Amino acid sequence: MRVLALLLAVKAACVLLVSSLTGTGAVNNSGRWWGIVNVASSGNLLTNSKNVQLVLDPSLALLSRRQRKLIRQNPGILHAIAAGLHTAIKECKWQFRNRRWNCPTTHSPNVFGKIVNRGCRETAFVFAITSAGVTHAVARSCSEGAIESCTCDYRRRGPGGPDWHWGGCSDNVEFGRMFGREFVDSSERGRDLRYLTNLHNNEAGRMTVASEMQQECKCHGMSGSCTVRTCWMRLPSFRLVGDYLKDRFDGASRVVYANKGSNRASHRADPRHLEPENPAHKLPSSRDLVYFEKSPNFCSYNGKTGTHGTSGRTCNSSSPALDGCELLCCGRGYKTRMEQVTERCHCTFHWCCHVSCLNCTSTQTVHQCL
């Protein structure tokens, strides 16, 4: 009976999935597709006879009709999207680990909380890093053969220089950009300033990945000589992408709506429709981040804005920077406690092949914001 009940539950879930993939009940809110990161877990994935992934969860209705169609047309791509989101969230948390806003996330469909309903710098970074994460993961999955509809980027072939030529398997960043633009941008609706800034920041994330592609080469020749080299293009590390976007966050441009219409058909933000709030400032480039409202006060909890505050956060009592107790705790002060920490130490490599370590316990001073 339990087996029969399980089979009926699976069948019902599949019916719900088909209904969500073909129905009209799509949710078009900006960023709702981020909920995939909570849906596309290994426990929710099955594979049919054609090796096509099915997600047994009607939460895919979080996607727009266009997004669901793109997943159906590109078998295997759901894993890449989820992986890209995981990477983007991890990078966001690392980049802002010492800031008052430290990229908090939830298990709700709107992963980043209410901050995405605003138009501040933090919102801009979230849209850029998640867009970059999808492009980066899809491009790599193509070259790894994990997506049926794409392969390596073989456009660069033949001679490349006097002692090297193009070859190998380049990461398919063009497919990653194309799919990212179609998938990510299709969740945006409207023709207002929020629509334009979201699309601009989405594109800034994709452009950063594409612009930081790196050439790698392998030598060929007798006895290890490098008579000729075969070269291909490789994706940058996502840490490099995060570092670049963090720099753009610090120098983000506050913009206003130029009221010249919008390029809705191409699903891209036209830079001509965004102008600096300060006429003396230059127009933002395609890789700059843009925002249109001041960031909320992240010092204290505020349910309306979705800010968690900094109470309980660990701070550095000797640092004058943003991670210092004076700035991170917003002048409220901090408490100090002693904590015992156990770490691996005195590690030794043994041939062949394992490493043995001892456990060392030390007492550390921990400062926490009041």
Swiss-Prot record:
Glycoprotein as UniProt keyword: yes
Fill in the PTM field for this protein.
Answer: Palmitoleoylation is required for efficient binding to frizzled receptors. Palmitoleoylation is necessary for proper trafficking to cell surface. Depalmitoleoylated by NOTUM, leading to inhibit Wnt signaling pathway.
Is Glycoprotein given among the entry's keywords? yes
Q: What happens when the gene is disrupted?
A: Morpholino knockdown results in broadening of hindbrain boundary marker expression.
Q: Can you quote a single GO CC term?
A: extracellular space
SS bond list: C92-C103, C142-C150, C152-C169, C217-C231, C219-C226, C299-C330, C315-C325, C329-C369, C345-C360, C347-C357, C352-C353
PROSITE patterns named among the record's database cross-references: WNT1 (PS00246)
Q: Which GO terms describe its molecular function?
A: cytokine activity; frizzled binding
The stretch of residues making up the signal peptide is 1-19
Q: Which residues are glycosylated?
A: N28, N316, N359
Ranges of biased composition (kind: Basic and acidic residues): 267-280
Keyword list, A-Z = Developmental protein, Differentiation, Disulfide bond, Extracellular matrix, Glycoprotein, Lipoprotein, Neurogenesis, Secreted, Signal, Wnt signaling pathway
Q: Where is this region: Disordered?
A: 261-282
Identify one Pfam family in the record.
wnt
Write out the similarity annotation: Belongs to the Wnt family.
Question: What is this protein called in UniProt?
Answer: Protein Wnt-1
